[in-house]
């Protein structure tokens, strides 16, 4: 008869093996294949692909899009989390469900929504055309689509933190004469800064890797409205495999750097993060 400790050891080993095998097979192996394929013709060929004018345009557009969408979503996430966590009002459950909407709606549908609203034949198309404003097939449309698919990340990180924090500290600060901004800066922000940082990092990684929604609203204009994921598709369809994998490798490296930064911050400030959660 097996002892309970034997069963637990076997179960633990089996679960670890399954997890490691799954991660290795479906995550690490494809990632390694991407890097090896990018360097198949040497590092000079990979760098040449990254220096191509269309690749440079895609890189710049991706970074600009993330630089605009992420701060705006951070502001929205703070406001939405504050409203949901601190106040009770009619429609609160509906607002919470709407915050999660991008998790359940296909990014392609999100892109089509913006085309129907802002496209030349859309609801606002004639007005935009008369005022010489271009949203679809231009940077504004790409930013809007990216914001749609990424806006839940910051809010979802902050809502539980703000709910646990309560309102006592803010009310005490206001009673002592602090303004709303001072209360947020000195009381609320220190308690949510790690959740805010994690949400921003996840939002940034998702923004740079977004494909579906951006593909619909960008028009796929090579050298103008192609982001890095779209440029990878174009290169791959043109049988330029080394160039495609080179750009994909850069995109993967950006995501890896984001994860490494998150892990380093967790390790460096582990005690402070634990203290915030205990509080």
Feature roles, as predicted:
Residues 17-22, 71, 97, 101, ...:
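Transmembrane alpha-helices
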Residues 7, 14-18, 26, 33, ...:
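C-terminal transmembrane helix and the adjacent membrane-cytosol boundary/short C-terminal tail
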Residues 28-32, 36, 75-80, 109-112, ...:
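Membrane-embedded alpha-helices of multi-pass transport/permease systems
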Residues 25, 60, 64-76, 80, ...:
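Hydrophobic alpha-helical transmembrane segments of multipass integral membrane proteins
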Residues 2-5, 43-51, 56, 91-92, ...:
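Membrane-interfacial helix termini and adjacent extracytoplasmic/periplasmic loops
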Residues 2-8, 46-49, 68-100, 112, ...:
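Transmembrane-helix boundary motif in ABC transporter permease subunits
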Residues 9, 46-48, 53, 208-264:
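Interhelical loop and adjacent transmembrane-helix boundary motif
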Residues 2-13, 34-71, 86-87, 234-242:
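Periplasmic/extracellular loop-to-transmembrane helix junction in inner-membrane transport proteins
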């Amino acid at each position: 008869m097996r002892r309970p400790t034997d069963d637990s050891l076997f179960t633990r080993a089996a679960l670890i093996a399954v997890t490691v095998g799954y991660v290795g097979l479906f995550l690490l192996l494809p990632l390694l294949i991407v890097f090896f394929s990018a360097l198949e013709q040497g590092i000079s060929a990979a760098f040449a692909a990254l220096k191509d004018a269309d690749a440079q345009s895609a890189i710049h557009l991706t970074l600009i899009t993330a630089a605009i969408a992420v701060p705006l979503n951070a502001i929205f996430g703070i406001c939405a989390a504050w409203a949901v966590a601190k106040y009770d009002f009619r429609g609160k459950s509906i607002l919470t469900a709407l915050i999660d909407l991008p998790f359940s709606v296909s990014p392609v549908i999100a892109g089509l929504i913006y085309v129907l609203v802002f496209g030349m034949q859309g609801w606002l198309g004639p007005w935009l055309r008369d005022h010489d404003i271009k949203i679809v097939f231009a940077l504004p449309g790409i930013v809007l689509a990216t914001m749609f698919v990424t806006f839940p990340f910051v809010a979802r990180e902050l809502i539980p933190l703000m709910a646990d924090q309560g309102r006592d500290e803010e009310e005490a600060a206001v009673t002592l004469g602090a303004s709303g901004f001072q209360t947020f800066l000195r009381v609320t922000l220190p308690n949510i800064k790690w959740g805010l940082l994690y949400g921003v990092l996840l939002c940034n990684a998702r923004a740079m890797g977004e494909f579906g929604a951006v593909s619909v609203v960008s028009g796929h204009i090579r050298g103008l409205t192609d982001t890095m994921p779209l440029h990878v598709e174009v290169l791959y369809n043109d049988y330029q495999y080394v160039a495609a994998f080179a750009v994909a490798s850069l995109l993967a490296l950006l995501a890896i750097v984001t994860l490494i930064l998150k892990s380093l911050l967790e390790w460096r400030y582990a005690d402070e993060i634990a203290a915030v959660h205990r509080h």
